[in-house]
Amino acid sequence: MVVTNRPKPEDVYSVESDALLPTEAGNFRVRVTVDDEGKEHSLLYTGLNSTTIPLVRIHSECLTGDAFGSLKCDCGPQLKHAMDCIQEEGCGAIVYLRQEGRGIGLHAKIKAYALQDLGLDTLDANLALGLPADGRDYEIAAKLLLEMGIDEVRLMTNNPHKINGLKRHGIRVHERVPHITGVGEKNKHYLETKGKRMGHLL
């Protein structure tokens, strides 16, 4: 739920802007903050109040999936589905983190894609480049939520690491809401790897 008189977390990021954002899913407000590395993270939200536990999605940037409609992953459909679900619920938020490629960056992600074209799976491709299988940190997401007074969420995720990451940084996860969408022939192996080797609940 949203605690309106909750003190802001220490070292909260600077708020750069907050404005109305009409979308195909419905009207949101978008709030952009800048972290201490200069990365801009966004919070897309609607209907936040002090009595309802909001439906929340933590979504890491995926240019290829979110913008280009790549079929190699399920990121684009997950983002759209989250926006639709939050509008239907009437209360929720999407934290959009600039953690492209599970935290390795766009350039490295495309290099990993090239290795996947040669037969490696999504995990082994990262490791072959000397990079972590998943380098994301959810402290950023927790701080953005706490800044808005949100300390308890219903989390749309298939990834237990997101649940644990939020809990470690002061966010109570009231409920995990499964978030399976966008499954197809092109990303079947990718999703199987996430389930079998990375602990995702698929």
Predicted regions and their residues:
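Catalytic domains of riboflavin
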Residues: 1-202
